Regions:
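Short, low-complexity N-terminal intrinsically disordered segments enriched in polar/charged residues
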Residues: 1-31, 126-130
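Short, surface-exposed coil-to-beta transition loops
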Residues: 68-70, 97-103
């Protein structure tokens, strides 16, 4: 059985994100993408447009001193959505993040048009980034 094409789309996205290849990310994110990062911390918010979304991504690496490290557990996809079961670790100002989370993407015309970052313990995530 072959993977759904949107599984491959996520794999390309993940490879570009983890290597900091924003040029490759530009190929998978719609110019009008919207990124939702819940919580009450310096990287929370609704980021409208690819440029704002990428700036939010960059801030994760900046604030963690480059230690932010996501790993993939599984990827589920259909024609309109991608759900990735994830885990992340990071260190910042003597604090450690070690937590599961879910990424949800809405896909249209082969591009990521909207995304959500959902953590198992948002309060701990807020404390880490604050």
């Amino acid at each position: 059985m072959t993977d759904h094409p949107n599984v491959e789309l996520f794999r390309r996205t993940y490879a570009a994100f983890t290597s900091g290849d924003f040029e490759a990310l530009s190929e998978v994110f719609s110019e009008e993408t919207v990124w939702h990062n819940p919580g009450r911390n310096p990287i929370s918010g609704d980021f409208v447009g690819r440029e704002a979304t990428f700036a939010a991504f960059g801030k994760e690496f900046e604030l963690s001193g480059g230690t932010y490290s996501p790993t993939v557990h599984d990827i589920l996809a259909n024609d309109e959505h991608i759900v990735a079961l994830m885990h992340a670790t990071a260190e910042r100002d003597g604090k450690k993040l070690d937590m599961d989370y879910v990424l949800i993407f809405h896909v249209k015309d082969g591009k990521l048009v909207e995304g959500w970052d959902l953590w198992t313990d948002q309060g701990t995530v807020d404390a880490f980034w604050s």
